[in-house]
C-alpha cells in the first residue's frame, strides 16, 4: 500500500483540524481547496474514488464515479487503479472487495454501517434455511459478505422480480432482508411460496404512506418516484389503484431507474421517495425539473458519516482498509455472478 509523505504542508494544515467523534470525522469543509487536494492525493495513491448516490453533495462532486452500489462495484472491478476508495456504507465496500479481491479497497469510515444489512445475521439465515430445507435463498445486494456467502442468488431492486421468476415455481424461496422489496416481488410475481424476512432500511421505512398521500394531494400534477424499499410503496400503488393519483405517474424505481426516468420525464415536478442524497444526482440529470423529497428528513446517518474529513484522512493514511475472508468472498462472488447471469441487474438499490 502507498504511504504518503506527511510532511506536505497543505496536507498537514488540512488534517490538523480533523476531529473524531462517535458520529464521524469532522473539522474539514468540503470546499474547492479540499476538493483539489482530494484529487491530488487520489492521483498520488493511484486510487479511484467512488461515491454512492446517497452521499453528501461534496463527496459526490469530487468522486470519479457516482452511482448505486452494484454499478460502483463493477466500476471498481474494471478500473485500472489498484486502490478503490468507496464512499458508501460498509457492505458496499465489501461487495467491491468481493468482485475485486486483488485490489486494495478503502472506506473513509469503517463505522458507516447499514440498518438493512444488519437486520439479518449469518446465524439467523442459517436457522431460517434449516426451517425450510431445499429452499432457494435470494438476498438483496444490501447484505453483508457473510450473508451473501450463504445465499444462492443475489438480486437488486431492478431485477428482484426476474430473479425470483427464474426459480422453479415448486421450490420455496427465502427472500431477505428487506420486507418491503420482498412484498413488492410477491405482489408482482403472485408467488405464494415466497417467504420474506422482516428486515428494513430505517430511512426508507420511515417514509410513510400518509406523507406520500399528503404530498400527492398537494402536488396533483407531479410524478412519483418511489423506491421499493419504502414503507410507502404499497400506498403509492393504492393511490394509483383507487384513482387518487394517475397510475402512469406512479413509478416504483431503483436509484438507477430514477436517474434513467429523470432524463425522459415530461413532468415539471417529481416527488421522490428515497434517501435525500439522491436529489443531488436527479437535479444534475434534469435541472429543469423540480425534484422534491416526499420526506426531507429521510437522511441516512451512516451514509453521511463519509465526510470531507473522513475522505481526506482515508487518502492520507490509507485507512480504513476493507478485508473479506477469501472463502466467504468466493461464496459471495458466486451468488452475485448468478444474479448477473440472469440479467437486468440494473441499479444496485
Curated annotation (Swiss-Prot):
Residue sites binding [4Fe-4S] cluster per the record: 114, 201, 300
Bridged cysteine pairs (disulfide): none
Miscellaneous remark of the record: Was identified as a high-confidence drug target.
Family per similarity comment: Belongs to the quinolinate synthase family. Type 2 subfamily.
HAMAP family: NadA_type2 (MF_00568)
Any GO BP annotation: 'de novo' NAD biosynthetic process from L-aspartate
Name of the gene encoding the protein in the UniProt record: nadA
Keywords linked to the UniProt accession: 4Fe-4S, Cytoplasm, Iron, Iron-sulfur, Metal-binding, Pyridine nucleotide biosynthesis, Transferase
Compartments reported by the entry: Cytoplasm
Name of the protein in its database record: Quinolinate synthase
Pfam families for this protein: NadA
Functional description taken from the UniProt entry: Catalyzes the condensation of iminoaspartate with dihydroxyacetone phosphate to form quinolinate.
Annotated EC: 2.5.1.72
Pathway(s) where this gene product acts: Cofactor biosynthesis; NAD(+) biosynthesis; quinolinate from iminoaspartate: step 1/1
Cofactor (UniProt): [4Fe-4S] cluster
GO molecular-function terms, A-Z: 4 iron, 4 sulfur cluster binding; metal ion binding; quinolinate synthetase A activity
InterPro entries per UniProt: NadA, NadA_sf, Quinolinate_synth_type2
Catalytic activity: iminosuccinate + dihydroxyacetone phosphate = quinolinate + phosphate + 2 H2O + H(+)
Free-text remark on how the cofactor is bound: Binds 1 [4Fe-4S] cluster per subunit.
Binding site for iminosuccinate: 52, 69, 140-142, 157, 227-229, 255
GO cellular component, one term: peptidoglycan-based cell wall
